[in-house]
UniProtKB/Swiss-Prot annotation:
The protein's role, per its UniProt record: Necessary for normal cell division and for the maintenance of normal septation.
The EngB-type G domain, residue ranges: 22-195
Pfam families: MMR_HSR1
Keyword Ribonucleoprotein among record annotations: no
Residues where Mg(2+) binds: S37, T59
Lineage summary: Bacteria, Bacillati, Bacillota, Bacilli, Bacillales
GO molecular function, one term: GTP binding
Organism: Shouchella clausii (strain KSM-K16)
Assigned protein family: Belongs to the TRAFAC class TrmE-Era-EngA-EngB-Septin-like GTPase superfamily. EngB GTPase family.
Cofactor(s) it depends on: Mg(2+)
Full protein name: Probable GTP-binding protein EngB
Binding site for GTP: 30-37, 57-61, 75-78, 142-145, 174-176
GO cellular component annotations of the record: cytosol
HAMAP family attached to this UniProt entry: GTPase_EngB
Amino acid sequence: MKVTKAELAHVAVKAEQYPKNQLPELALAGRSNVGKSSFINKMLNRKGLARTSGQPGKTQTLNFYEINERLYFVDVPGYGYAKVSKTERAAWGKMIETYLSEREELKAVLQLVDIRHRPSEDDQLMYNWMKHYGIPVILVATKADKIPKGKWQKQLTAIAKTLDKEASDPLLFFSSATGLGKDEAWRTILNHLKVTE
């Protein structure tokens, strides 16, 4: 998809701060430092729109990125990061759970996992939780440029097996560094939303 307009339109910690224009939303979930901000920047062709950080746990709000006035990417706080207080983690958890389980505009979750590693227990819990709530999932294996191309399929198979992935859930590889997988990711997203470019 050709992105002509992209902006951070809303920052929310509670439902009354969510956008009111009823555009379809795709949430991005993943462990801290899996590359959600880099994914957003590469997909939207906007360097620095989503702030990347070497410090895990940087995103602490629901960040709504409006794209071409047609849809939103919603960056949610990364999970699995221990260096925040239990109180903060509980607050994030409640905020994320409320959004994911109750938001009517949410059409799917892009769950990002690192292609170099088997999904963590947190990844598995998140995937199973979304399946429990009937939320469609598009799995994106990030950092594909970090391993040889010959190992991609083996790693994708391991990811699918570890998560006990449902056959209907797409599993894509992606590299924010090279743009690898970007077109396929957009095709999958638009197909899921049943909209054309």
